[in-house]
């Protein structure tokens, strides 16, 4: 903190980004694996926090890391390194199919890939029950075709994966599902939003245009996505 972060957070805010090497260190030092609000994820990464064994890791240690990062006195920095990850990854780990988690999680915990939570929309805001981003099942039943937009998405500009709330059923909360959308699938575009502050957190407008998402990327059960969304903060 004293030598590699605090002296530079002002520059990073002005540049609207934090160097990738800093985020990578969050992975290699084992911090990301310990910041999921659950057991330390030893199955998916060999990285370890040097001072605490995985068996002794608990929420108190998570608090210590968050508190230490907050010494930078930059909300943009803190949101950059743990914001999108902290709310986008828990639903995947808790409710994603094992094959999906096995494929995606190691890269995230090692700091090589980034993930965010994509819920809020231009018209619905955080009113999740009324979101309109739509996912229709393809004729062969192998993919969801996603169309719609998300707004104010923390870390979205850099993210490889989007834990995304979509409408798959009727109006209201019982028609919401959660999909893990991969940028590499194509049809995903992102643009930075210039907000009043937290510039280095990467607040983003995300557009999905005919994005093909494998049905295996469904997180939880179809039309029961509220459970997965709540898991982002538990």
Language-model regions, residue ranges each:
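A short core secondary-structure module
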Residues: 142-191
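Glycine-rich phosphate/pyrophosphate-binding beta-alpha loops
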Residues: 124, 151-157, 197, 234
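Short glycine/proline-enriched turns and hinge-like loops at secondary-structure junctions
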Residues: 127-129, 155-160, 173-175, 199-201, ...
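Amphipathic, small/basic residue-rich leader segments at the start of a protein or domain
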Residues: 1-82, 99, 103, 107-110
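A structural signal for short hydrophobic beta-strand segments in well-ordered beta-sheet cores
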Residues: 133-137
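Glycine-rich beta->alpha junctions and the first turn(s) of the following alpha-helix
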Residues: 188-234
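A short, Trp-centered hydrophobic/proline-enriched beta-strand micro-motif
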Residues: 111-119
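N-terminal glycine-rich flavin-associated loop
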Residues: 77-99, 125
